[in-house]
Amino acid sequence: MAKPTISPGMQQYLDIKENYPDAFLLFRMGDFYELFYDDAVKAAQILEISLTSRNKNAEKPIPMAGVPYHSAQQYIDVLVELGYKVAIAEQMEDPKKAVGVVKREVVQVVTPGTVVESTKPDSANNFLVAIDSQDQQTFGLAYMDVSTGEFQATLLTDFESVRSEILNLKAREIVVGYQLTDEKNHLLTKQMNLLLSYEDERLNDIHLIDEQLTDLEISAAEKLLQYVHRTQKRELSHLQKVVHYEIKDYLQMSYATKNSLDLLENARTSKKHGSLYWLLDETKTAMGTRMLRTWIDRPLVSMNRIKERQDIIQVFLDYFFERNDLTESLKGVYDIERLASRVSFGKANPKDLLQLGQTLSQIPRIKMILQSFNQPELDIIVNKIDTMPELESLINTAIAPEAQATITEGNIIKSGFDKQLDNYRTVMREGTGWIADIEAKERAASGIGTLKIDYNKKDGYYFHVTNSNLSLVPEHFFRKATLKNSERYGTAELAKIEGEMLEAREQSSNLEYDIFMRVRAQVESYIKRLQELAKTIATVDVLQSLAVVAENYHYVRPKFNDQHQIKIKNGRHATVEKVMGVQEYIPNSIYFDSQTDIQLITGPNMSGKSTYMRQLALTVIMAQMGGFVSADEVDLPVFDAIFTRIGAADDLISGQSTFMVEMMEANQAVKRASDKSLILFDELGRGTATYDGMALAQSIIEYIHDRVRAKTMFATHYHELTDLSEQLTRLVNVHVATLERDGEVTFLHKIESGPADKSYGIHVAKIAGLPIDLLDRATDILSQLEADAVQLIVSPSQEAVTADLNEELDSEKQQGQLSLFEEPSNAGRVIEELEAIDIMNLTPMQAMNAIFDLKKLL
């Protein structure tokens, strides 16, 4: 049987596809991007496009699917959003001039981590992460946002830190520079749903790589660079020099902690609404929005940097009218970072340059407004603002205000910018008049009253003559086309004018394109200055945003202390307050003196324990961002980390139960926390048997108290734990107050000193709407259980009353009354001392001394 032959075009496709086996290959053929073989079958299903075949009559037709080139971006977006790579093969020569098969090559590979263009633009960062290791114990991690040029690297000492940083960066694609174990591969691909791309080669760019980085950081950064250049197929002038950062330079929080605190999105809805980001976002620019997210994600630990931000916010609060002018001016600023990156990618169109020009037109006014504050705190910012008047002049002089996005259809360069272009336009403009003159002249000479000149791409300019007037056609007319009811004619004069006009049009279009490319190249030389300007404007935008929020919600400037004390007077949970309204929210004060490390919080479910704990965390985060906070007065230490376990949730992806997740997060806290950390644990230990959970909860509290010394809030439903305050000197009990009247319970949402006396679980069930008969039965059972408990504690048998102390203890154990806490280690000695006292020969003074000595033993 003869081997089926493959056409040269399909052979070209197969040769290119061989180099991109892990990507969908979009193969440009005329006005379509075609996909073949398995790519076509899969793409047709995913994109819901028609699946056809090439060579339908062949024994084995080749599956084929295609999308129009002008709408391809929306299909690329769908594939990339689902985690696929897309290789784009373009025609590299004019098909009309090609000899043989049109030359094609891949010009870009779009991956989840390298998206620059999208039909659904998003102001958020899109980070591509690279990791490398020599011993799988220490790791270099580098990340980049290809759309903005941001490039950073750090060194991490364990894989859990790598995992946490990847989650915090919300990366979707990881470039791996070493051989992963099966376990780590499964973790990244299956549990974290990441696209992995392996890269062995390194690209050393002396302009981007800082030699002061560690070897692993350099390796990760260079492999990341190599991957980006290999997929983007071009020099990227907008990439910034890699910046080293340390995790410890910021307030450390795990992804789970940020999620439980609803920092960047509401954990229940995965939406912005209801998050801290939603509350604080009064930014007016895309760069400011990204920077605000970064500030929330990475609060500071440097007191000086925090105070620098506070000082500027205070200035913005003190000068309302100037700040209002500043806010209005920021509205006219486009996304400088991404416009600069589009220039670097060679994708910037006339509209992009117009937006950049309009932005640069606003910068002098923004600088002038900042100067008008006349405050030294703003001097550094003012001095950083580079107005670049020559670039603004170039763009606004060269690009026509009405220019569209396309760069090949003309009308993009302003009149007066280029003399030759103006000449071509004059020919085209006057040519229209010349044609009108020819039409009038020939109509009069021929006597054909309906004679007119029309135009189409096939025949060019022609005289339109109906059949009834064919006898009047002059001899110098020559036929160009015959139709059913008319004919088309040309003349030498018309052809000459047409030639001049078409040449002028073609030359004009080509010249406009060349001029635009030259202008864009000049803009590219300003990219680094534009990026610095973007950072400065973003900083101004975030600071004014925090000032606006502080003013709207009456926030105060927090103070900081070195005495490890927390003082929050009438604090509020910032986002809950915004949802409920200031008038409805019940504030709570929080106090930890230098001798208090742990608050043990008891109270009914739904009474506000979790809100109280989150209130403290959000106050710390907002304060260490440099912002103002929701309270009447705040004085805090600077924390180095926040650890939380708030809210129950199984980890369904990895198959871990609530209790396992609790223990893992507790492990992270007790191992990584320092005496400068904040720990928030809500109902820890509820996922196992009562005594197991209680024992673990107590041991964790003791461990934190004795060894970690971190400021800790520990909410619990184990009321027995409140007795710990008698043993642990730096633990205090607080509870959520309730009002019980006529069988009805009101949660006051107010924190008070001391332990709670009841849990009110049945009342919560009533609020939830459980059936009345079920609740009545629960009340009866509770009464019986409480009666039994009282009997065990206060009504021992008559025999036990008359027995000695040791027999009484044994009797309690036999009845099932377990002691949660160990008996004091001196109990036996106290008993011995009591038994040794001769009561009949004891003077009053000796009795007092004996009591004093016994008290010291307790």
Swiss-Prot record:
Keyword Phosphoprotein set for record: no
Gene3D superfamilies: 1.10.1420.10, DNA repair protein MutS, domain I (3.40.1170.10), MutS, connector domain (3.30.420.110), P-loop containing nucleotide triphosphate hydrolases (3.40.50.300)
Family annotation (SMART domains): MUTSac (SM00534), MUTSd (SM00533)
GO molecular function, one term: damaged DNA binding
Free-text function comment from the UniProt entry: This protein is involved in the repair of mismatches in DNA. It is possible that it carries out the mismatch recognition step. This protein has a weak ATPase activity.
GO CC terms in record: cytosol
InterPro entries: DNA_mismatch_repair_MutS, DNA_mismatch_repair_MutS-lik_N, DNA_mismatch_repair_MutS/MSH, DNA_mismatch_repair_MutS_C, DNA_mismatch_repair_MutS_clamp, DNA_mismatch_repair_MutS_core, DNA_mismatch_repair_MutS_N, DNA_mismatch_repair_MutS_sf
Keywords of the record: ATP-binding, DNA damage, DNA repair, DNA-binding, Nucleotide-binding
UniProt key word ATP-binding: yes
Stated family: Belongs to the DNA mismatch repair MutS family.
GO biological process: mismatch repair
Protein name, per record: DNA mismatch repair protein MutS
Any Pfam family: MutS_III
Binding-site list for ATP: G603, P604, N605, M606, S607, G608, K609, S610
Signal peptide range: none
